[in-house]
Amino acid sequence: MTSAQLTNRITLLVLWIVATACVSSHAAEVVYVDQSGGQSFSRQQMETAAGFYGLGQNAVVAGNKRDIVTTLKAVRDVKTIAVIIAADALPTLNEEQLLSALRRNGTRSVPLLIAGITERTDPRLLRRWSAGAINGCKEMPVEKGTGSYAIDMGNEVAQPLGGYKLPLNQSEARYLMLESTRGGQWIMAAVSNGTQGPVFVRTTVGGQEVFFSTANTPVNIPITPDPYRELAVFSSLAPQLMFLRYAAGEHAWHSSGKFANLTIDDLWLREPYGHVDYAGLLREMQLHNFHTTLAFIPWNFDRSEPAMVSLLRAHPERYSICVHGNNHDHQEFGPYETHPRARQVNDIRQGIARMERFSQLTQIPYDAVMVFPHSISPAPTLADLKHYNYLATANSLNVPSGSVAPSDTEFALRTATMAFSTFPSLRRYSAEASIPESQLAIETFLGNPALFYVHQGFFAAGMGSFNAIADTVNRMQPDTQWRSLGYIAKHLYLEKLRDDGNYDVRTYSGTIRLDNVHQQDATFFIEKDEDFALPLTVRVDGQPYPYERSGTRLLLQLPIRAGSGREIAINYDNDLNAAAIDVSRTSLRVNAIRRLSDFRDNVVSKSAFGRWFIRSYHDNEPDWNRTLGSLALLLALGMLALYMRRSGKRSRMVQNESRFVEASANGRTRN
């Protein structure tokens, strides 16, 4: 061992000892000041937003002047990174004392939000706490279906949401009356019937930032797996989420980067495939800065054209491969009544073996990310993907078939969920349909990866068909990293700064690349939801590493030097021997389906009518199957009738011929 290696190991050991000694909670805290200990809606919103960001919560009651000492102590605590005061508590507080308690030596003062303001809130208090910028609060009726929230362009608190609209789901809204000459800046405003009123405002009082938000009424948002539900959920919490993200900064859960990906389903390596020209698409990716993953059907493992193999091998920064089922014989991972789980496990195993063979033949790696054909599988199949060490699954819905969407805000606002078999299931958007830019802005604001998918027919108008979406994403977030699904899965974790200078990490995927991009060495306290249903081993940079089990969480502590990174892999034991699995194509049914699919994509889709038929069939498959079945039956009956008619005609001709022969014979006899 060299002296440099020895020094490095000693440094890591010291970091480990320090980390082990620091096992208490080090989360930053939000102080919530209320008039009473009741569970008001404003408090519920604060708790939901703080929980989303992984922030601790310290609720204090300021019901009378004797509670002021406790309140000020909580505000001065070094862990406090944000203070929220319920408007009802303002009469018992002294603004000079509280604003003084928010100041920090050498750093930014702790931001303050006064929340839950209504038309009953004393205007004199609002003027005092805003240095005259806010004169009061009024109610605005909202006609159903006409209201929205507008986000101001000119502030960093809401970026990149500036200029977009959010749904206003309530039947009424309250807005703040601003004094235009006192410097109050609106961040979010309610808009209805031509009237616009600020609902979230920032002011500055003696150098201290003070935010104000109006109260809104609870609204019932249906619990569904629909990704567009995110708009309504986010809108109901927008001021709290904006304020706490701004106030907490690195102390709040945040992604390791801004990621995006385009996936084209069904493709294999032939040129062209349908409307996809690989070289032409590469030029568009280079000009408009995006990355394309091919969702590759393992059945095609040995059909790749050499020129396309060379193109992909030369451009791994633009092209990548993930797994798309196995045979793709319609919904092969569908309900167990028609697609038994044991058969699905066999498809997973054979799919891996075929992809391994594909990599051997082409020297192109593939990402162990499953895109299910047609729709996502039942939940137990996700456990099987995990068993065989898949990184994640990405589909139009992230809720397995037959399962119910989780009711929590975390599910609605995150791209990935661990609610099913503690395996990461990601949602993605079809770029073949219109995607509201406000939806993409929310994903960027929350740090979610923006995942898109299309089929080859999307490029019927040309290889530049995706450019507008890529340009929009890059404009919203100029440092967006367009990467493969595998890269994104390995960076699918959240981190936040602790008050001891180390970092908490919450990982989704079983394998992650954890980089210390900070200026100092640090210990990373890593946690992952885990049901421990399978035997597992944790490895760091290929070597076994100790971990703890705490309920349904796997915990480990990992020191990392500044500017370096480590790979953490949770490996699940299984009996897979890919080399021993038969990868041949022996099913006549599957072979016929795949050949017909190639014919559909490479011939039928070339015409406008063909593309219409493909879209219509995909959207209305049961109806088309019934229609085609009826047409086939009518055709069969028609052919049968024609056959019988011709058979009857031939029979009559034979009878007539027999009579003619008999008559001729009788005539010869008489002669």
Residue locations for each model-derived region?
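A glycine-centered loop/beta-turn motif at secondary-structure junctions
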Residues: E29-V30, Q44-Q45, A49-F52, T80, ...
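Aromatic-Pro/Gly-enriched surface loop or interdomain linker
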Residues: S24-T80, M285, L294
